[in-house]
């Protein structure tokens, strides 16, 4: 069964219940399809930039189903848990932050960063699954040398390729 266009947290609940009740594969494209393609792109970009997956720092902007699935797959592929910072519309998802639901709280880490601008400094990878224009040229400049930027917001990206090229 291929699930499509079901928002979090409903998608997690529906997928889990279907997997419990059915003896056939269940695939939520928004989560798993996005994660598979993004990991493939990351592996390619790391090869080109000569960076190692075990050493990179990633900032994931967005905390929906696709962001969580990408984060899980990145971790399962060798990115250290402490090297992934997830940011939602209220800021960094950190341990001790109030009002995190059970799904978001699973991605909370120990960090002093509270904003995207703080978290992005020195990052090797930006994965945007959020909103148009959220990543600025100033933020790109603050990233590591040869940063990897996946601006995947739909329909308009977090930053345009033209803006990145100006940096």
Residue ranges and their predicted role:
Residues 2-56:
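Glycine/serine-rich phosphate-binding loop and adjoining beta1-alpha1 elements at the start
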Residues 36-127:
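Glycine-rich phosphate/diphosphate-binding loop of Rossmann-like nucleotide-binding domains
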Residues 133-167:
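Rossmann-fold NAD(P)-binding glycine/threonine-rich loop
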Residues 5-8, 29-32, 89-91, 131-132, ...:
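Short, ordered loop/turn segments at secondary-structure junctions
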Residues 24, 81-82, 144-148:
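A short helix->loop->beta-strand "cap" motif at the edges of active sites that frequently abuts
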Residues 10-14, 18, 22, 34, ...:
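General structural feature for long, well-ordered alpha-helical segments within catalytic domains
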Residues 18-23, 76-79, 141, 164-166:
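Short, surface-exposed basic-aromatic patches at helix termini and helix-loop junctions that form
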Residues 2-5, 26-29, 60, 86, ...:
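General beta-strand structural signal in soluble alpha/beta enzymes
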């Amino acid at each position: 069964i291929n699930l499509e266009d079901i928002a979090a947290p409903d998608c997690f609940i529906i997928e889990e219940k279907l997997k419990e009740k059915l003896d056939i594969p269940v695939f939520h494209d928004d989560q798993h399809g996005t994660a598979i393609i993004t990991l493939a792109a990351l592996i390619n970009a790391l090869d080109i930039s000569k960076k190692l997956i075990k050493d990179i720092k990633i900032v994931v902007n967005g905390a929906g189903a696709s962001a969580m699935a990408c984060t899980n797959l990145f971790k399962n592929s060798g990115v250290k848990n402490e090297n992934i910072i997830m940011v939602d519309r209220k800021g960094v998802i950190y341990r001790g932050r109030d009002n995190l639901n059970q799904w978001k709280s699973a991605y909370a880490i120990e960090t002093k960063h509270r904003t995207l601008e703080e978290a992005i400094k020195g990052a090797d990878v930006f994965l945007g699954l959020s909103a148009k224009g959220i990543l600025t040229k100033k933020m790109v400049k603050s990233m590591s040398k040869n940063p990897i930027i996946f601006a995947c917001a739909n329909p308009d990206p977090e930053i345009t390729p033209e803006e990145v090229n100006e940096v």
